[in-house]
Amino acid sequence: MGLYAAPTYLANAGMPLHPKNLEAAPHHIVGFLGSSTGRVLSCVLHRGDEQVRVMGRYAIATDDGNAYLAAGVAGLGALWLPQYMAAPHLARGELAPLFEDWSIAPMPLYIAFPPNRHMGARLRVFMDWMVELMKTHAPLSGAVPHRR
């Protein structure tokens, strides 16, 4: 996971020097709404013994991943993403990394299905594909995919 912002956002708001700077004007954050609470998820960054929870001024908040990413790329505010999602936008110059000496805990990914049903071949193939896909990106995020 990393914290990113569009170059247009940084040109307008300036480069924040510390994560807490994102909580004050002129900075904004693109908020992501948690599915279980409907509240904006906070971002917790770590550097050595220092831990900072960022709850900033939200330009927009959404529960849709595509809208979340589009808002960040459009320059509406800073956002946190898994590195594999940010990588193509970094390569195209649409996003720039912030606070590279800080870390954010990886975001868990779950596959949910009814436990009382037989696991069909399609579901098994999908689950195997997801595990392999995440293994490819695990070195980027520090996550270790596993299977039950």
Regions of interest found by a model, annotated:
Residues 4-30, 48:
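Flexible hinge/capping segments at coil-to-helix
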Residues 12-13, 32, 89, 98:
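Residues that scaffold the ATP/ADP-binding catalytic core of kinase and kinase-like folds
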Residues 1-3, 7-8, 27, 43, ...:
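Small-molecule pocket liners
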Residues 19, 41-55, 89:
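Ligand-binding cleft/hinge of the Venus flytrap
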